[in-house]
């Protein structure tokens, strides 16, 4: 549930909830991609009263999270009805429209005996009631701001606690918030981040997050990918949430490896830290410090060979190494020459124009998503030009 933005799905069923202006459908191949509820349309609140009323009856929790993040307020700026509402209320900032919308949501929830949970953007102005429970996801600063304004806050900044983020640059997962492993999770410290004693009184706790759409393409009928992404990061999260990290990483790492047997007994497909790999004088030397066994793969073969000593080769780009311990496994680690072959230099051109927000250099640098300016039509093309044959 996310209001008033992120609502394209319900808008496709109830297009009348959108703002009152003709959308740009040329660049979207005929689709209306507007995703925000019109704040000025009174009928919208009747629909939401019905939806949230049923939701509140289903769930016994004190809080119902109603969202509030990533609202495309340009839609409100273009809507004559929303602009008229702002004028009547003496508003100049569209964030005040979100305040108004969320106040209506809070009233609906209160009528059903519930309190609202919201993302940190919903309290940008500080205008919402302190009855709201804030989930600070955008950054540590967002959590600092919310607690300073007096909001009870669940601290969950993406760069530390979004477990759908990849753990090294070569692994699977998102990377828009950060690339991090359990060591960085353990390194989060409220004092170092600048939380005062007064702000700490507004911290409800820490929370880890994994968004399910990141799971759909990874055999969701099996827990392997979810386990790998969450464990042992979730162990480090629990540790700092309950006891802090004053003893330092080295001491905790020894404690963490004791959890391996527990996780294996529970059938958890956890992630091991990658082994340390060096290639010198024509041979690979590999070390693992957690008692796990080391294996290597050569070329395209899926066969794993047990590492028993230095591996001699004049073709280091063909080798990958990993470790295993019961149900746990590490990511693959390779020589830098291997990654050069996976990320060959390339230039991207197309007939569809380049998005300014997601330029082609994101893709050509292997650092993120790139988009065209419009959808594909007949005779359109995308060309990848490599500096060297691949």
Residue ranges: model-predicted function:
Residues 326-334:
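Short, exposed coil/turn segments at beta-strand boundaries within extracellular/luminal domains
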Residues 5-46, 74-99:
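Aromatic- and acidic-residue-enriched carbohydrate-binding clefts of CAZyme catalytic domains
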Residues 50-53, 57-135, 140-147:
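Gly/Pro-rich turn-and-neighbor structural signature
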Residues 116-121, 128-132, 138-285:
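Flexible, acidic glycine-rich loops studded with aromatic residues
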Residues 301-317:
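Short, solvent-exposed S/T- and G/P-enriched segments that are highly enriched in secreted/extracellular
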Residues 334-389:
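Disordered, acidic Ser/Thr/Pro-rich linker "stalks" and the adjacent N-terminal cap
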């Amino acid at each position: 549930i996310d209001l008033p933005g992120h609502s394209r799905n319900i808008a496709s069923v109830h297009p009348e909830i959108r703002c009152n202006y003709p959308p740009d459908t040329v660049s979207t191949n005929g689709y209306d991609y507007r995703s925000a509820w019109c704040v000025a349309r009174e009928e919208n609140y009747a629909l939401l009263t019905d939806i949230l009323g049923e939701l509140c009856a289903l769930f016994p929790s004190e809080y119902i999270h109603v969202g509030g993040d990533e609202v495309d307020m340009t839609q409100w700026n273009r809507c004559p009805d929303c602009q008229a509402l702002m004028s009547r209320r003496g508003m100049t900032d569209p964030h005040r429209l979100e305040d108004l919308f969320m106040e209506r949501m809070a009233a609906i929830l209160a009528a059903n005996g519930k309190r609202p949970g919201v993302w940190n953007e919903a309290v940008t102005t500080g205008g919402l009631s302190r009855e709201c429970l804030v989930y600070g996801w955008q950054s540590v600063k967002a959590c600092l701001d919310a607690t300073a304004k007096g909001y009870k806050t669940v601290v969950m900044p993406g760069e530390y606690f979004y477990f759908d983020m990849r753990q090294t640059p070569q692994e699977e997962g998102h990377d828009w918030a950060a690339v991090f492993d359990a060591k960085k999770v353990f390194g989060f410290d409220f004092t170092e981040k600048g939380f005062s004693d007064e702000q700490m009184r507004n911290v409800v706790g820490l929370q880890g997050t994994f968004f399910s759409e990141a799971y759909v393409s990874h055999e969701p009928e099996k827990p392997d990918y979810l386990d790998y992404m969450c464990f042992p990061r979730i162990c480090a999260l629990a540790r700092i949430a309950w006891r802090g990290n004053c003893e330092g990483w080295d001491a905790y790492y020894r404690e963490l490896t004791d959890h391996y047997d527990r996780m294996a007994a529970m059938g958890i497909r956890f992630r091991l830290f990658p082994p340390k790999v060096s290639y010198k004088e024509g041979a690979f030397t590999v070390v693992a410090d957690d008692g796990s066994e080391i294996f290597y793969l050569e070329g395209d073969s899926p066969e794993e060979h047990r590492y028993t000593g230095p591996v001699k080769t004049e073709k280091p780009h063909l080798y990958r190494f990993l470790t295993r311990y019961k149900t746990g496994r590490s990511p693959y680690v390779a020589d830098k020459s291997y990654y050069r072959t996976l990320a060959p230099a390339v230039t991207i051109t197309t007939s569809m124009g380049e998005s300014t927000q997601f330029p082609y250099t994101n893709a050509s640098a292997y650092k993120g998503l790139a988009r065209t300016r419009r959808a594909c039509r007949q005779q359109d093309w995308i060309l990848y030009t490599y500096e060297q044959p691949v």
